[in-house]
Amino acid sequence: MVNDTISDMLTRIRNANLAKKTSVSLPKTKVHEKMCQILEQEGFIKTFSFSETNTNELIVDLKYQDFASFGNYGVGKPCITNLKRISKPGLRIYTNSREIPKVLGGMGILILSTSKGLMTDRQARKLCLGGEILCSVW
């Protein structure tokens, strides 16, 4: 059994990207669904769907850059360069809306857990909300 499901999710996506997989399966939780929804909106993954065979499984279709520019080598570079867990079970990291850091000068995103649910750093700044910084994606 996994104690930190968010770290497990990020590790599964990272490993699937490195192995050039087209999709990866995750345990279905509300947090995973919302994080996948954010990653899809920001353009880091193609889509996510629920498994038809297993009701407790979430299927994430990974997104790669156009492989036509890479010749006949198959899949191009992954859209997700790095996934990093920030707040961990042993060391929680919180921030207010004025001190939310930018990832790579705004090129990446932070996913925050706020009182209004999970959202990106841009949405949290716009709504003047702080919260726990779950992870960074770029």
Swiss-Prot record:
Keywords: Chloroplast, Plastid, Ribonucleoprotein, Ribosomal protein, RNA-binding, rRNA-binding. NCBIfam families: PRK00136.1. It holds the Pfam family Ribosomal_S8. Part of the 30S ribosomal subunit. One of its GO terms (cellular component) is chloroplast. This is Small ribosomal subunit protein uS8c. One of the primary rRNA binding proteins, it binds directly to 16S rRNA central domain where it helps coordinate assembly of the platform of the 30S subunit. GO terms for molecular function: rRNA binding; structural constituent of ribosome. Belongs to the universal ribosomal protein uS8 family. It is found in: Plastid, Chloroplast. The gene is rps8. The lineage of its organism: Eukaryota, Viridiplantae, Chlorophyta, core chlorophytes, Trebouxiophyceae. It comes from Chlorella vulgaris. GO terms for biological process: translation. It comes from the Eukaryota.
